[in-house]
């Protein structure tokens, strides 16, 4: 894991059609939360399948379980034949203190047996302020993920510092729309946000 500091299907042979379906899609299965009523019964019957496409809407998963977060990140580099995205790298942008590096390596090692690949191809960058985050998203995001790392999957953790009481409402109201506009410009990657709260202008799940 690299840490950074600051036409119609029937007209085509079936195997080509299947490959095309896999090419730009990433399927995630969202389980009910642990605190749902009658949880055991719900877990057996109620699951949400989400199909994400490169250049599509930006999904925000609210209060996701750590296992879901880590599995999603690792599956970004897993081959398509094993329900992964087969991205050259996965870029993870951390804006909070709740990111579990150990769980990612555990998932890569024990579940998928690709620990070495995960350590090499999962790129992690941490930012500490809303201004650092805004600068990276607005100025550097596209060139970093498209040109340098060629990431088909980009993960952003946290709520863009919107819950930080030390940041003025004026700064939040000014910077947040610009950051969302910047990430929506990215057309060659799937961008997912894992946030403790729902976020405006994104497709929220959970």
Residues covered by each model-derived region:
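Conserved inter-motif catalytic segment of the P-loop NTP-binding fold
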Residues: 88-165
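Short, flexible/disordered intra-domain loops and linkers
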Residues: 165-174, 201-205
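Helix C-cap/helix->beta junction micro-motif
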Residues: 84, 148-150, 186-189
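Well-ordered, non-membrane alpha-helical segments in soluble/globular domains
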Residues: 70-73, 136-142, 169-183
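The Walker A/P-loop phosphate-binding site
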Residues: 1-110, 114
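Hydrophobic helix-cap positions at the C-terminus of alpha-helices
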Residues: 76-80, 140, 144, 186
């Amino acid at each position: 894991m690299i840490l950074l500091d600051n036409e119609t299907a029937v007209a085509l042979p079936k195997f080509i059609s299947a490959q095309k379906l896999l090419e730009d899609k990433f399927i995630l299965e969202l389980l009910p939360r642990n605190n749902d009523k009658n949880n055991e019964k719900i877990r057996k019957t109620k699951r949400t399948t989400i199909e994400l496409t490169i250049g599509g809407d930006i999904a925000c998963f609210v209060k996701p379980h750590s296992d879901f977060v880590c599995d999603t990140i690792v599956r970004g580099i897993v081959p398509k034949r094993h329900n992964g995205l087969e991205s050259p790298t996965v870029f993870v942008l951390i804006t909070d203190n709740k990111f579990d590096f150990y769980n990612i390596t555990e998932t890569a090692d024990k579940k998928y047996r690709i620990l070495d690949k995960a350590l090499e191809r999962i790129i992690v960058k941490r930012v500490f302020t809303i201004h650092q985050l805004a600068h990276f998203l607005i100025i550097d995001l596209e060139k970093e993920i498209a040109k340098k790392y060629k990431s088909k999957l980009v993960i952003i953790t946290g709520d863009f510092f919107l819950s930080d009481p030390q940041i003025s409402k004026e700064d939040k109201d000014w910077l947040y729309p610009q950051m969302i506009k910047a990430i929506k410009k990215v057309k060659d990657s799937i961008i997912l946000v894992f946030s403790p709260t729902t976020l405006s202008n994104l497709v929220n799940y959970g």
